[in-house]
Amino acid sequence: MTSAHEIEFFFDCSSPWTYLAFHNIQPIAAALDARIRWRPFMVGGVFNTINPTVYASRQHSVPAKSAYAKKSLRDWARWSGVEITPHPLTVFPVNSVKVMRGCLVLDREGRLPAFARAAFEAYFRDDVDISQDDGVRKVCAVAGVDADALLAAIADRAVKDELRANTDELIARGGYGSPTIFVGGDDMYFGNDHLPLVQAALLRLRGH
């Protein structure tokens, strides 16, 4: 059961806004002595199931809105102290399934945060294609993870099933994208810009 001292953070390393939220939620949790329960999932699986129009919207975006979205991302990155490449990514969107399975494997050892951070930085700062084994190896090198062991572990059926189960669970709970955060069990928040509301919800649950 989720308590007032736990945050569930459903995330996919393919999203730049999730990168910001991953970075920004950690000091909030630390300040409130709240535990983050990391919940890796595949945002593409969510889109395919309940939000397929996202693909069409990317193909037929409003130019002014797209330009402002890029500016907003740069502004938030600067405010957060996160470095994101100013150049278009070589591969976008990226298939992040290997690193998300890796997150599941490493979460059991308490090593998920360092690995996920390295994956976010590799993709959004250094333009590394994290869908490929070579990209995963670069992430592992930064995070201090045995790449051969991890690549073998993520091929396990149980790991694949767990990632699919997390994705299905998020859909069942009303989620539609990344990052999705739950406080107190079923109080859902979406996006980096809602982290102040996450903080307020944690305080409210504690009677503040």
Model-derived features with residue positions:
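C-terminal cap of thioredoxin/glutaredoxin-like
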Residues: 3-34, 39, 118-208
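Structural alpha/beta surface segment adjacent to cysteine/selenocysteine redox centers
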Residues: 20-123, 201
